[in-house]
């Protein structure tokens, strides 16, 4: 009986070790993978700037990029794309087997307080895949969701700019500068010295890529990718929001 129990304990321990080693191997592979920066193409009609009110926030299209700001505030945007903002791919064992990095933006649709951006991603195999990126004000922030028409693409990448001298704290911090930082499944992100806060949610491991100066890229599992953007006056406000969102996603 004791021998059976010991065998069971050793079996569980080895299984746990295997999971840890597999996760570490995946993280190592993912951190070496080049980022999914995309090139944005828009039709001539989209050269006209436009603004969309989202509760206490405003999403502005400047003709070449997006900027999310606190409405009526002179503070810099809390999220700004500066060009391509969405990429996707098919990932296996921490490596991208297919990359989709040519992006088109073809429509804005505002229904109630939900703004949807729709377009296509051109992948390395030459095929076009439709996407929908939505912004909706929720609980004092803006929730971002990504939808892809092709279930073959299991990873999405959301990209944005970071201000000069903007320092990060939270799950990632300044020590992550110049690295691709693998985050745990669940809710994770950062608060910055500029008062900009980001939280991402994924049921699988996710990552924040800080290898390129002044730019950030978040990668997550397509089927569960959600993100929240909001202004936070200090790290304590960010931590409180993080805890609330973590509890909400577990319901």
Language-model segments: which ranges?
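Compositionally biased, intrinsically disordered low-complexity segments
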Residues: 1-4, 22, 99, 108
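Catalytic and substrate-binding clefts that recognize carbohydrates or anionic sugar/phosphate headgroups
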Residues: 29-250
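Hydrophobic alpha-helical membrane-insertion segments, chiefly the h-region
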Residues: 17-27
